[in-house]
Each structure stands twice: as C-alpha cells, then as structure tokens.
Amino acid sequence: MNKEEWLKKGYVTESVDKTLDLKAEIDRLRKEKNAIILGHYYQSGEIQDIADFVGDSLALAQWAAKTDADIIVMCGVHFMGETAKVLCPNKKVLVPDFNAGCSLADSCPADAFAKFVKEHPDHTVISYVNTTAAVKAVTDVVVTSTNAKQIVESFPKEQKIIFGPDRNLGIYINSVTNREMLLWNGACHVHEQFSVAKIVELKKQYPDADVLVHPECKGAVAKLADKVASTAGLLKHAVNSPKKDFIVATESGILHEMRKQCPEKNFIPVPPEDSTCSCNECNYMRLNTLEKLYNTLKYEWPEVTVDAEIAKEAVKPIQRMLEISEKLGL
C-alpha cells in the first residue's frame, strides 16, 4: 500500500486482479460495509448499472440526505461528494477519483465569487449546485437545473438576484421567468461544445425527431429545442413522448438510461463542434471506473472532507433548496 503515491495521483493506484469478478466484489464490499453507491447520469454505463441509485444532481442530494448507509460512495464529480458530506457530516463520503472535478465549478473561484457578492449587497445569491462548498457558503439558496426556474420564481419580481456560475443556465432562466438576474460568467466545457449547425444537420437526417437540450447549452442551441430540461427532465420527456427519434444535446452518459428505459426508441447524441475530440463526454465524469470504485470501497479512500466552518454555512442553502423542492413536489 503506497499512500504517498495515492495522494499524489488522487486515487488508489493499486492494480486490481484481472481474474476478479469486480461486480460481485463491489457488491460484497458494499453489503459488508453498509455502503451505498450513488451514480450520476453522466457516469459510464457500467458504473450506472452497479449503482444503488442513479439520478441527476438534485436526486443525488435528496438520496444522500435520507440514506441510512454508513458510507456514501459518490460516483460523479467532486462537488457532488462535497454536497453529500455537507448534508451528512457524520457519514464517510468517498469518491473513486479526486481528480474528477468540474469545469463549471472551476470557473467560479470562491474568493472571487465572495468579492462579487460583497460588491452587490442588496442581491439574493442563488448558486447552481455545480459549485464548491466554499461558494455555497456565501449563497442564500442552491439550485439544480431541475428546480432553478421554480426557485427563482419563488422570489418577488423586484428582488435583485445574483445567479452563478453558469451563464447559459442563467440566460435561459432569465428568459423563462422574465427576469434580469446578474450572472456570473461561467460555463460547462461539455455543453458549450454543442452548436446550432450540428443540430440542424441532424434534424435534416431525422426530421421528425424531438430535439432535447440541457439548459447549460448556449441560448441559440436552446431555441432549437422541443424540450429544454435537466437530465432527469429530458429522460422523462423521452419516456413519455410518442416520438421514436430524439436528438440529444447533453453529456452522452444519459443515453445509457434512455436506451434502457426506451429500447424501442432511437437516441442520437449531438456531436461536439470540435470533431477531433469526444467532447460530448465529460472527461472528469469518465475518470471513475469499476476498478477505482472497487479500490475505493476496499480501502475507504479517497475520503471527502469539508472544513467545518464552511460546511456549517454551506448546508443552509442546500437544505433550503431541498425544502423548497419538497414543497414544489420536485
């Protein structure tokens, strides 16, 4: 066991015996340790299939808040692990790879955001869940793409609002609520890649297809959509729609669950503008593998920690989001 190397790499580097039945071993370890595995829709199919629960950011936070497991393994990105730890300070929260960050969270450094908030003292601060715990600590209420519109609408029209860090989501929420929120200039590197040209091209090939777009995409892309929604909302639309073809502009991991729930339907991922990369896949999300998940459960590392003072402040806007969401039936 080379802990020094693990710390340097950000994950357990021990090689896994290739003859092991990894799924069976992961199952054994989670039962022995009373652990729950939570997986985001943007994880690889094999991670989603072994998770106890798969969902979007809101659902994962809700599940973490109510679990009676002793250990939460968050198969997603680092801020999701932080959110779980803030909600469950007495539980052990693990992530398979500390390097699984988030370009959107990185676009909003806590010090810079706190300064921005201080410069606008008469504003309510609404932060997207894709932020660090330190950013949440200077926030009044957290939102996800599932509940952002409804939570923004719960404030009086005259209330000034700072919304961060995703400018595209902020622009979309401004348009559907007729607001002029002050927006932080951040973005998701995956959703920024989707272009009007690629969707128009696919629409020619599949003229009857519904276009499904995540609100983190640019406004011009969202205008082409038959449905703009969170990953959970897009999945629900696909399940309930009579259509057979769907052009999907979000991280391609969601296609796994769409195809599982609707095997008779055709889901076409929108390719990124840059054809030299697989940029409709989040490279951070894909850092998590079955091997890393197995080692994480085996050694109970990497473990997520959050500074106690930050956690004390960050839990308030997260709890507020969960309470509002429950009242709204989300």
Language model feature labels by segment:
Residues 1-248, 255, 260-270, 274-330:
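Active-site loop-to-helix "anion-binding N-cap" substructures in soluble metabolic enzymes
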